[in-house]
Amino acid sequence: MKIIRVQDQIEGGKIAFTLLKDSLAKGAKTLGLATGSSPISFYQEMVKSRLDFSDLTSINLDEYVGLSVESDQSYDYFMRQNLFNAKPFKKNYLPNGLATDVEAEAKRYDQIIAEHPIDFQVLGIGRNGHIGFNEPGTSFEEETHVVDLQESTIEANSRFFTSIDDVPKQAISMGIASIMKSKMIVLLAFGQEKADAIKGMVFGPITEDLPASILQKHDHVIVIVDEAAASQLD
């Protein structure tokens, strides 16, 4: 695991984009993408660039259960607004949050991941150490699955909704085993509220109580953090 410290989120996005360009030059064809505030500066760099992504495939980590793609809080909407509308890909995959059978949808998504091995996976990290929507206690062997979101995650995401009561209580998420199959992982974390999770991920025991700790076992992980998020690493 390599740690890169940056001044702020803007610099973090630039460095992540440089890593992406290197990966594309080596033949990367499938990107694993994340939502939330952490990757936004990275997506801004992609949008500003002259690179053409029309031969690439993207696979997103997760989607809320119960939100249509037209909901402005769906991750499908987020990705279109922040990246896909400006930079079309050959194919974009996200879980279907309105699937009538969400368990079958999870299995369908695993098949997509199997058919499109991820070359470059972007991650954020939750305050409780979750990656994707893999909450503490999630088995490291889990593949795509339906998640009951923890109260801390619902609270953290409530800032994007009119009311905390409007935050979906479930999501479909790529599993930890799925994430670990990615050839390269770039995790972005900014802000003091991520410091405890980053410390546990880097130095703590590998435990399902802190899902991101499994990344210690991955061969190619780069963690991009600002000084606040890195404040407990010294």
UniProtKB/Swiss-Prot annotation:
<dbReference type="InterPro" id="IPR004547">
    <property type="entry name" value="Glucosamine6P_isomerase"/>
</dbReference>
<keyword id="KW-0119">Carbohydrate metabolism</keyword>
<feature type="active site" description="For ring-opening step">
    <location>
        <position position="128"/>
    </location>
</feature>
<dbReference type="GO" id="GO:0019262">
    <property type="term" value="P:N-acetylneuraminate catabolic process"/>
</dbReference>
<comment type="similarity">
    <text>Belongs to the glucosamine/galactosamine-6-phosphate isomerase family. NagB subfamily.</text>
</comment>
<feature type="active site" description="For ring-opening step">
    <location>
        <position position="135"/>
    </location>
</feature>
<dbReference type="InterPro" id="IPR037171">
    <property type="entry name" value="NagB/RpiA_transferase-like"/>
</dbReference>
<dbReference type="InterPro" id="IPR018321">
    <property type="entry name" value="Glucosamine6P_isomerase_CS"/>
</dbReference>
<dbReference type="GO" id="GO:0006043">
    <property type="term" value="P:glucosamine catabolic process"/>
</dbReference>
<feature type="active site" description="Proton acceptor; for enolization step">
    <location>
        <position position="62"/>
    </location>
</feature>
<dbReference type="GO" id="GO:0005737">
    <property type="term" value="C:cytoplasm"/>
</dbReference>
<dbReference type="Pfam" id="PF01182">
    <property type="entry name" value="Glucosamine_iso"/>
</dbReference>
<dbReference type="InterPro" id="IPR006148">
    <property type="entry name" value="Glc/Gal-6P_isomerase"/>
</dbReference>
<protein>
    <recommendedName>
        <fullName>Glucosamine-6-phosphate deaminase</fullName>
        <ecNumber>3.5.99.6</ecNumber>
    </recommendedName>
</protein>
<keyword id="KW-0378">Hydrolase</keyword>
<dbReference type="GO" id="GO:0004342">
    <property type="term" value="F:glucosamine-6-phosphate deaminase activity"/>
</dbReference>
<dbReference type="GO" id="GO:0006046">
    <property type="term" value="P:N-acetylglucosamine catabolic process"/>
</dbReference>
<dbReference type="GO" id="GO:0005975">
    <property type="term" value="P:carbohydrate metabolic process"/>
</dbReference>
<feature type="active site" description="Proton acceptor; for ring-opening step">
    <location>
        <position position="130"/>
    </location>
</feature>
<comment type="function">
    <text>Catalyzes the reversible isomerization-deamination of glucosamine 6-phosphate (GlcN6P) to form fructose 6-phosphate (Fru6P) and ammonium ion.</text>
</comment>
<dbReference type="GO" id="GO:0042802">
    <property type="term" value="F:identical protein binding"/>
</dbReference>
<comment type="pathway">
    <text>Amino-sugar metabolism; N-acetylneuraminate degradation; D-fructose 6-phosphate from N-acetylneuraminate: step 5/5.</text>
</comment>
